Amino acid sequence: MKFTHFFVALILSRFLQVISLKHWIERIADELKERDVEEHVVASGTSISGSIHIGNSCDVFIASSIAKSLKKDGFKSRTVWIADDHDPLRKVPYPLPESYEKYLGVPYSMIPCPEGCCESFVEHFQRPFLEALERFRIGVEHYSGARMYTEGLYNDYIRTSLERAPEIREIFNRFRDRPLRDDWLPYNPICEKCGRVNTTEAYDFSGDTVRYRCECGFDGEMDIKSGLGKLTWRVEWAARWKILGVTCEPFGKDHAASGGSYDVSSIISEEIFDYPAPYPVPYEWITLRGEAMSKSRGVFFTPGQWLEIGPPESLNYFIFRSKPMKHKDFNPDMPFLDLMDQFDRTERIYYGMEDAASEKEEQKLRNIYRVSMIEEFDLPLRPSYRFMTVACQIAGDDPERLYDILRRNSQLPEELMDLELDQLTDKQLEQLNERIENVKNWLRLYAPEFVKFQVQEELPDVELSEPQLKFLQDVADLMESREMSAEELHDEMYSILRRHGLKPQKAFQAIYRVLIGKKMGPRAASFLLSLERDFVIRRLRLEA
């Protein structure tokens, strides 16, 4: 009996170990596999109330990754994305003028394009997002909430909701302090007079005709088949699950609150529409520089903006490196370099180019990178992002010089060290050019001033102490005497500054002042090795 218990415990331990080695995306996929369905539909939805940012589009990235994990294991799955474009405009989004206040309460689908460049308000904000998704290789079945109504997909569910309004009202009242009125109906017509949908209330119906009143004073009726109205959100969400056959849906934590949208919609789905609620994946908000993202205040960062400064895999990494309910703050300024350091290290560990601190860390980082990958390929040619911020400023628009700087500083994979730029494959050139463009965009858009520099063509007018002058002379002599790596030069410079009784800050300040005319600059050893050797030697000797 003891042996039986031992083996059961051992098997359970091994099973839990295998489970723990999987990424949370894969563990969700494993749970979905237990459901008896022919195909998994992983849904996501976004309100088109302005620019679609990385905060309110998280569910699309999570949904796509779950569906990919299911497909990888041989299960049928697809990702759907619903544009909630039948919702009313509640705030004027940045940077639209105040004149758009006249559209408050009007469904997004009925608001004109703010710049006259698209057919509608919805297309204006939706198009850049869908174009960005293509770069992430996220393929979604796109549904328009407005078209779902006008095409009649909701008609049967509207009829059921009106007929069973007392039951739905009772479900809502379970979670309300003040009960809904006895004549309340879970449907809001679009006012025939003012065009608003959030100021109307339906109070009676007969067949497909609904009677309503609006705060503008209008009292009228409409046919539900016209599509000129919408179900109350929590009823609409439940209906949508059944219409699309949804089996899993990620959503923001506000919907996951006790007694919130998911709880109420789940009951309606099961008790009114006879459909099992989908597997929920709630996630925490992403803040921007510690501040909640807001379309109306212009505090947001879009997937398209991310692609200007980082590869698509890096946004996936940012989202998937921690559990969905863990708080995430994004800062595209100096902290972005730390994020890219972590991403670059994770990538190198995944491809076996660098060792992790432990087996546990290696497995964790490999899992994160695996679900972050856009496509399988050999080690991407992505030199250190942080180093590239220096190299790009030195090389300017000269790709040959940039490539030489990377090679001299051992920033290329070992197998490429003996190759010239024109010997790289098309894929390697594409990856290198992407990183160059990303880094240059970051320098232009987000880099603090102290990161930016320009090597001075002429010796700046500087005053240096005697120890600083001797330090520069000795570094010049050292560089003239032999070739060395950045690490070797770094160690030698510390020996020299100690010999002259200099603090590191004062010593390196002397280097920066004679080369770029500033007190601060990039890491000194790599910086010196990135410049033309003869120029550096002459400048450190104050000869040029």
From Swiss-Prot:
Pfam families: Anticodon_2, tRNA-synt_1f. It catalyses: tRNA(Lys) + L-lysine + ATP = L-lysyl-tRNA(Lys) + AMP + diphosphate. One of its GO terms (biological process) is lysyl-tRNA aminoacylation. ATP binds at residue 295. GO terms for molecular function: ATP binding; lysine-tRNA ligase activity; tRNA binding. A motif ('KMSKS' region) lies at residues 292-296. GO terms for cellular component: cytoplasm. A motif ('HIGH' region) lies at residues 48-56. Its EC number is 6.1.1.6. It is an enzyme of class 6 (ligase). It is found in: Cytoplasm. Keywords: Aminoacyl-tRNA synthetase, ATP-binding, Cytoplasm, Ligase, Nucleotide-binding, Protein biosynthesis. Belongs to the class-I aminoacyl-tRNA synthetase family. PANTHER family: LYSINE--TRNA LIGASE. NCBIfam families: lysS_arch. HAMAP family: Lys_tRNA_synth_class1 (MF_00177). This is Lysine--tRNA ligase. It comes from Methanothermobacter thermautotrophicus (strain ATCC 29096 / DSM 1053 / JCM 10044 / NBRC 100330 / Delta H) (Methanobacterium thermoautotrophicum).
